[in-house]
């Protein structure tokens, strides 16, 4: 077996050069120990004999030299070099001849680093894969291995990157990584998971398996142990947009567009440039030059966070532009067009810059001072007098992937009680001041002046609820000391303040369970024996003749802008050598309601600012400057109630023009007057609730040069302006017009307003690239090629049936060099088609026609009728049908006489067979001609029958006799006494003869 071992020695040395471990594990049950089955693949894992541990790194790269490099990083670098158990990290496939040096980075232990992702590129490594003992496999030589390999191995964690040492025939991967892959540092949960890197070649898929067999013999070759290492080569074919991907880790370098590709491609490029600098530094990219073709894109993103941060794209990347990534990683992606267009070009330069902490938040009722925002810088906090700092007083900016402060910003609070030793000057305030205090409080403050000095208390504000809340100030150091002020006993505050007989004051504040108010604010000053105390004026200043205020010192007071001096003398003096004291009380500065101001600059405040103003107030201020000047009003604070009104008048009384009238809160704004005077009126709602602290208004005013004109308007390209008058005073109108071929975009008419600003923004002239809509044509429809009518668009008109097109049926939009695009012709018209008329028809005999005309136009209708006793035979209405020539729809009708015999003769009923569409007049005539004779005949026969049957009492069947009837002579003796009849005379009755 020794000859076989000698033959395998070169192969073993080659494998060791690639980092393969040939320790023979114990084989059992078809699988070597230390191998885990994960998704069908063999993955190496730590064994009990070789526990998992961290790997330390060393580097031969020079220390990062930057102008703002912090020494904190140098300690981390030196610490990494001094460790003795460090190993080299396996290499990463890298593009040959990179634009910038590719060096490994040390792994510093940064503050709070475990919770922040750090950029790490995966690097490949090799590992031995134990298999089943095999003794019949022949020896394997490196020559049988394909030069294109896919190698999988465990990778120790860490952010370092190194250039690989490639074997003969191997090439670095140029396959761009997946877009969804974001390189991040492994956290504690990822320490045992291997990284996988690939060396991939584009070609046909081929699988090659090589076997390495080593044998050892003990004794007389009685026992043989064989270890076989199998390396599987997988060559995949990936059709990618283009072979370009680079990684950069130096402090600065250049990014150039790919120009000389190793292999041609028939699709566009999709290139990635990954940049990583030291944690604690950001990436700054400057555009040196860029020239892209239409359709190409360049995007820049910041990496290292939960999601990529878009920074810029090709529309933002202009020459000289600087883009900064807020993290220490950045990625640039370039996508180009396929041949034959060819890719565009660009040249970028990147460098690392030191990241900084955010500016710390200033505490309310306090301030902050910052030495530097870079790592190592500090921030110091302090509170206003009367407030105590809660939290760290000093913060330090720590270096990390994203620098941060070592603690949260503190806050300033008003404590409930406390002991103040060596009290010289300061304030004590109730908890929550200037807001309301809490219920059920019992606070005690002990003030102690330096030895040999006394204390003076000044009441800045005392506001207690009208119940059992109480403030007591005692002239001593305990609760048993005699009180010098008790809110239960004193209704008004002492304007002159309080003086202690010794060096102590004891202040007690107690509140009950109901009601709350703003509380108190007391200012204290310590002063020496034989001197007066230091005076104080709220919202004002003073100047003194001697800083220690001995007897004879004079002090002069003044108020801040917007405040007025009240209830005191402007000048006071320290008198009485035996018991030094001021001859007058200190004055007070208050924001008053109303006033006349003649200063060139000043402030107008709401009444009692910053305290709440009162209800139902009506205040008027007059501001006056020189006649040739004007006033600018800068309204910086406006927080009033919805029922309150603040009005500005452009003049010296309330009848002037109103500049503006406002209610409710409003942000910062300015007003300008056209006069040398302005009147300000404030009216508060008498029924509204009082607002809180700093609710009101703050108005700064300034005297400005007279300016009765609006700013001069510039000319616009491809157009001109026409003012209504030479001077641009209020009311002036300026009209803008464009040259032929251009149109106005925006408002063409601008007016100078009262505030001396223009009513609209400046317009522009834009090139006209389309024709106007030619409109619709009556009695037609149109077909358009483009709805916006650009140059070259067409419009076709088609007339409705019965109408004839007059003009061009197709209009085309043509461009003109000296004007706007114009249609090739005017819009056509659709006129009614002209047809020959029908000749007039004569009226039928015994009939009439309507209308009576000789010619009738196409579509006209003629109506016929007959005289009484005649019946119309034919159509009562006929129409002139359009045509070439036009003709009548039916022949003309005739009128026939109506007879009784014809009524019984069916042939005479032709008129009755006329269509129901005949006129109502003809039907009435026919009915009358038939039924009236019948009715007359019936009446005649009935009358005769009635006469003979009723009046004569005879049967209707008896006929009169032809001879006269005999009669007897009537004598005189008869009883007939009718004087009408006499003897021998004749009388007639009815139709009979007597």
From Swiss-Prot:
Domain annotation CUB: ranges: 416-527, 593-704
Database matches in SUPFAM superfamilies: Complement control module/SCR domain, Spermadhesin, CUB domain
Residues bearing attached sugar chains per UniProt: 289, 399, 436, 541
Ranges of biased composition (kind: Polar residues): 112-123, 172-185
InterPro entries given in the database record: CUB_dom (IPR000859), SEZ6_CSMD_C4BPB_Regulators (IPR051277), Sperma_CUB_dom_sf (IPR035914), Sushi/SCR/CCP_sf (IPR035976), Sushi_SCR_CCP_dom (IPR000436)
Domain Sushi: 355-414, 530-591, 708-767, 769-832, 836-897
Topological domains, Cytoplasmic: 947-994
Residue intervals passing through the bilayer: 926-946
GO-annotated cellular components: apical dendrite; dendritic shaft; dendritic spine; endoplasmic reticulum; neuronal cell body; perinuclear region of cytoplasm; plasma membrane
Extracellular side: 20-925
Endpoints of the signal sequence: 1-19
Modifications after synthesis and translation: Glycosylated.
Region (O-glycosylated at two sites): 38-47, 59-63
Pfam families per record: CUB, Sushi
Membrane topology note: Single-pass type I membrane protein
Subcellular location: Cell membrane
Mitochondrion found in the keyword field: no
Cysteines paired by S-S bonds: 357-397, 383-412, 416-443, 532-574, 559-589, 593-619, 710-752, 738-765, 771-813, 799-830, 838-880, 866-895
Biased composition (Pro residues): 93-107
Family to which this protein belongs: Belongs to the SEZ6 family.
Biological function: May play a role in cell-cell recognition and in neuronal membrane signaling. Seems to be important for the achievement of the necessary balance between dendrite elongation and branching during the elaboration of a complex dendritic arbor. Involved in the development of appropriate excitatory synaptic connectivity.
Name of the protein in question: Seizure protein 6 homolog
Organism (species): Homo sapiens
Gene of this entry: SEZ6
């Amino acid at each position: 077996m020794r000859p076989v071992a000698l033959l395998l020695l070169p192969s073993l040395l080659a494998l060791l050069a690639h980092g393969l471990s040939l320790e023979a594990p114990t084989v059992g049950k078809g699988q070597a120990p230390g191998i885990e089955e994960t998704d069908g693949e063999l993955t190496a894992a730590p064994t009990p004999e070789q526990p998992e541990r961290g790997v330390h790194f060393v580097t031969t790269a020079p220390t990062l030299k930057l102008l703002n490099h912090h020494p904190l990083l140098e300690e981390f670098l030196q610490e990494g070099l001094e460790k003795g158990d460090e190993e080299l990290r396996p290499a990463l496939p890298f593009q040959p001849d990179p634009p910038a040096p590719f060096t490994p980075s040390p792994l510093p232990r940064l503050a709070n680093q475990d919770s922040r992702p750090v950029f790490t590129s995966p690097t490949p490594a090799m590992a031995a894969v134990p298999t089943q003992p095999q003794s019949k496999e022949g020896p394997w030589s490196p020559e049988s291995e394909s030069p294109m390999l896919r190698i999988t191995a465990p990778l120790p964690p860490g952010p370092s990157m190194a250039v690989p040492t490639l074997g003969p025939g191997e090439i670095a991967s140029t396959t761009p990584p997946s877009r969804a892959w974001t390189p991040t540092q492994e956290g504690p949960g990822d320490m045992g998971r291997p990284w996988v890197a690939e060396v991939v070649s584009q070609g046909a898929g081929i699988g090659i398996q090589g076997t390495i067999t080593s044998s050892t013999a003990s004794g007389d070759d009685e026992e043989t142990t064989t270890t076989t290492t199998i390396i599987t080569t997988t060559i995949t074919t990936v059709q990618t947009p283009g072979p370009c991907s680079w990684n950069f880790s130096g402090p600065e370098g250049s990014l150039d567009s790919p120009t000389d590709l190793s292999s041609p491609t028939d699709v566009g490029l999709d290139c990635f440039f990954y940049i990583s600098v030291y944690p604690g530094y950001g990436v700054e990219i400057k555009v040196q030059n860029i020239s892209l073709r239409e359709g190409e894109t360049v995007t820049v993103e910041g990496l290292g966070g939960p999601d990529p941060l878009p920074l810029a794209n090709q529309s933002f990347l202009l020459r000289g532009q600087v883009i900064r990534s807020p993290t220490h990683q950045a990625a640039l992606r370039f996508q180009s067009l396929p041949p034959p267009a060819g890719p565009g070009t660009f040249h970028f330069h990147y460098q690392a810059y030191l990241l900084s902490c955010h500016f710390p938040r200033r505490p309310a009722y306090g301030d902050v001072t910052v030495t530097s925002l870079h790592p190592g810088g500090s921030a110091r906090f302090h509170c206003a007098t009367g407030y105590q700092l809660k939290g760290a007083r000093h913060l330090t900016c720590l270096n990390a992937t994203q620098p941060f402060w070592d603690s949260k910003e503190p806050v300033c609070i008003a404590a409930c009680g406390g002991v103040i030793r060596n009290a010289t000057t300061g304030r004590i305030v109730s908890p929550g001041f200037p807001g309301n205090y809490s219920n059920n409080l019992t606070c005690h403050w002990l003030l102690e002046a330096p030895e040999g000095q006394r204390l003076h208390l000044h009441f800045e504000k005392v506001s207690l609820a009208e119940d059992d809340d109480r403030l007591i100030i005692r002239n001593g150091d305990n609760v048993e000391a005699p009180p010098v002020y008790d809110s239960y006993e004193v209704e008004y505050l002492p304007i002159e303040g309080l003086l202690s007989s010794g060096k102590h004051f004891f202040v007690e504040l107690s509140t009950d369970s109901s009601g709350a108010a703003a509380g108190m604010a007391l200012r204290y000053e310590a002063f020496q024996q034989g001197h007066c105390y230091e005076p104080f004026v709220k919202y004002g200043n003073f100047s003194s003749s001697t800083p220690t205020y001995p007897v004879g010192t004079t002090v002069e007071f003044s108020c801040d802008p917007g405040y007025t001096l009240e209830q005191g003398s402007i000048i006071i003096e320290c008198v009485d050598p035996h018991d030094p004291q001021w001859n007058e009380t200190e004055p007070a500065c208050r924001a008053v309601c109303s006033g006349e101001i003649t200063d060139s600059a000043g402030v107008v405040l709401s009444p009692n600012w910053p305290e709440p103003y009162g209800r139902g107030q009506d205040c008027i201020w007059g501001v006056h400057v020189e006649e040739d000047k004007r006033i600018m009003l800068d309204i910086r604070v406006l927080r009033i109630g919805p029922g309150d009104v603040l009005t500005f008048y452009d003049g010296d009384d309330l009848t002037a023009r109103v500049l503006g009238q406002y209610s409710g809160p409003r942000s910062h704004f300015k007003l300008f007057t056209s006069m040398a005077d302005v009147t300000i009126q404030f009216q508060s709602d008498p029924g509204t609730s009082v607002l809180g602290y700093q609710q009101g208004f703050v108005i700064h005013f300034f005297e400005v040069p007279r300016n009765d004109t609006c700013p001069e308007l510039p000319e616009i390209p491809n157009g001109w302006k026409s003012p209504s008058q030479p001077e641009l005073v209020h009311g002036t109108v300026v009209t803008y017009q464009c040259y032929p071929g251009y149109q106005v975009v925006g408002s063409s008419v601008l007016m100078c307003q009262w505030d001396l600003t223009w009513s609209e923004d400046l317009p522009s002239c834009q090139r006209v690239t389309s024709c106007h809509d030619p409109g619709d044509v009556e009695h037609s429809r149109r077909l358009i090629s483009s709805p916006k009518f650009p140059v070259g668009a067409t419009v076709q008109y088609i007339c409705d049936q019965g109408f004839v097109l007059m003009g061009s049926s197709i209009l085309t939009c043509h461009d003109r060099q000296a004007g706007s695009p114009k249609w090739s012709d005017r819009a056509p018209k659709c006129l009614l088609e002209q047809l020959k008329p029908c000749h007039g028809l004569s009226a039928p005999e015994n009939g009439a026609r309507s209308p009576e005309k000789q010619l009738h136009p196409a579509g006209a209708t003629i109506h016929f009728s007959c005289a009484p006793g005649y019946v119309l035979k034919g159509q009562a209405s006929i129409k002139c049908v359009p045509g070439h020539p036009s003709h009548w729809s039916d022949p003309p009708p005739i009128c026939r006489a109506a007879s009784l015999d014809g009524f019984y003769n069916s042939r005479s009923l032709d008129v009755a067979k006329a269509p129901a569409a005949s006129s109502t007049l003809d039907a009435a005539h026919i009915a009358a001609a038939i039924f009236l004779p019948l009715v007359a005949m019936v009446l005649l026969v009935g009358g005769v029958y009635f006469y003979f049957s009723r009046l004569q009492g005879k049967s209707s069947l008896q006929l009169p006799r032809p001879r006269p009837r005999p009669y007897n002579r009537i004598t005189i003796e008869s009883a007939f006494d009718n004087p009408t009849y006499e003897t021998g005379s004749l009388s007639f009755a009815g139709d009979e003869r007597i």
